[in-house]
């Protein structure tokens, strides 16, 4: 595999890949037809230049079509990685990492995932985020310093798992 081809690939967990496929299916089978109906409905109300409903529906359509293009592109470039088969103690894509904030003692656990599947509420951290970039390549008991919006933060890595 040449380097250029690999650069175009987007690493993704199987769960993340399935989620993107589901979102794409929902957009193409539900949202797209619905917005086309709304545009037709708004159009039937006459003068389009003064028609806020029509303008709004067209904007929504543009957002939906943009997202569909993004998703199709991401799915076509996806390199699905079986996280359970990753070996080693150092942090790589897919790792579930427990860290401790050296200042507050607060413990947090994150899984490092692709940028299309990041979801902070569910502790899915984008591989492109400053924290994930700081963690990659490190291992248990390593200390990591990250520039955050709140200044320099220091963390200790408590565990690294591939689950």
Where on the chain are the PLM-derived regions?
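Short intrinsically disordered, low-complexity coil segments enriched in acidic
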Residues: 1-3, 141
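N-terminal cationic and glycine-rich segments that engage phosphates or anionic surfaces
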Residues: 3-69
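Amphipathic alpha-helical coiled-coil segments
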Residues: 65-79
């Amino acid at each position: 595999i040449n380097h250029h081809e690999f650069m175009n690939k987007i690493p993704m967990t199987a769960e993340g890949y399935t989620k993107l496929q589901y979102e794409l299916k929902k957009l193409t089978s539900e949202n797209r037809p619905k917005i086309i109906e709304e545009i037709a409905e708004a159009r039937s109300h006459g003068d389009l230049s003064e028609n806020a409903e029509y303008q709004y529906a067209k904007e929504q359509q543009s957002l939906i079509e943009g997202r569909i293009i993004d998703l199709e592109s991401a799915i076509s470039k996806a390199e699905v990685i079986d996280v359970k088969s990753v070996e080693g103690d150092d942090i790589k894509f897919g790792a579930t990492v427990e860290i401790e904030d050296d200042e507050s003692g607060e413990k947090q656990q994150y899984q490092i995932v692709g940028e299309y599947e990041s979801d902070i509420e569910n502790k899915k951290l984008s591989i492109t985020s400053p924290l994930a970039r700081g963690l990659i390549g490190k291992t248990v008991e390593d200390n990591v310093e990250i520039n955050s919006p709140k200044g320099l933060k220091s963390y200790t890595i408590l565990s690294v798992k591939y689950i």
